[in-house]
């Protein structure tokens, strides 16, 4: 696995162990795990999503991060976070958002190449603030 894949796996496991709802195909608990394992081997990618309970908590979490950038693109060497409901799905209807699994408490994380321990610490401190 490349660095961002490994870090995404670590973050997903870290959040899941703390009771946060995580969508990441590398987790054995994911409904997509077996399909992803067959299709991708042990490379589950560098993107995961979290559900934090409310829109306010999602915003607070994002605003307390120091390393991750709050931007709506992917494909950067840096870790990026965004709130899909108010960025890339801002013009979608409620039905379209629901069909795509986009909720007000959803946060998308695209893991970059930063030190995994730095990211884990940063995400943990942000989680503790909400």
Task: Specify the residue positions occupied by each region the protein language model found.
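PLP-dependent enzyme catalytic core of the Aspartate aminotransferase-like
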Residues: 63, 79-130
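Short, small-residue-biased leader/transition segments that mark boundaries at the very start
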Residues: 1-3
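Conserved small-domain helix->loop->beta segment predominantly found in fold-type I
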Residues: 5-72, 76, 93-98
């Amino acid at each position: 696995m490349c660095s961002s894949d490994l870090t995404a796996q670590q973050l997903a496991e870290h959040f899941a162990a703390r009771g946060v709802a995580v969508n990441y195909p590398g987790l054995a608990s994911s409904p997509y795990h077996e399909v992803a394992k067959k299709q991708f081997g042990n490379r589950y990618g560098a993107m995961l999503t979290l559900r934090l309970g409310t829109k306010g908590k999602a915003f607070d979490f994002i605003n307390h991060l120091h390393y991750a950038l709050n931007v709506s693109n992917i494909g950067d060497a840096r870790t990026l976070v965004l709130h899909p409901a108010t960025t890339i799905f801002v013009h979608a209807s409620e039905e379209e958002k629901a069909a795509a699994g986009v909720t007000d408490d959803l946060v998308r994380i695209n893991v970059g190449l930063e030190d995994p321990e730095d990211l884990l610490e940063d995400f943990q401190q942000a989680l503790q603030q909400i």
